[in-house]
Amino acid sequence: MTLQEAVAKRLTNLLHEKNMTQYALCQKIGMNQTTTYNIMYARCKSVTLKTIYYLADGLGISLQEFINDPLFDKDNLDID
């Protein structure tokens, strides 16, 4: 899977775990809903570390916790 797909899946999983909506996350971090929608459906060509930091912060976790998931193992990612 691509990095964008891994971020999308992780974000979706965390929102479910935290029982939080995309809208609530957007309100909390001040991000446009279209941006988070594009991230959640892997429609962004790239997602910056800064954006992932804001998403993680809005979910009440650290950047490390966001990335510390098997989705981000090198064997699971197609990195060109």
Where are these regions (language model features)?
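Intrinsically disordered, low-complexity basic tails/linkers immediately adjacent to helix-turn-helix/homeobox/MYB/SANT
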Residues: 57-65
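Short alpha-helical DNA-recognition segment
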Residues: 19-38
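The alpha-helix within a helix-turn-helix
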Residues: 15, 26, 56
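Phosphate-coordinating loops and pocket residues in cytosolic domains that bind phosphorylated ligands
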Residues: 8, 41, 68
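Short, basic-rich loop-to-helix N-cap that marks the start of a DNA-contacting helix
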Residues: 43-54
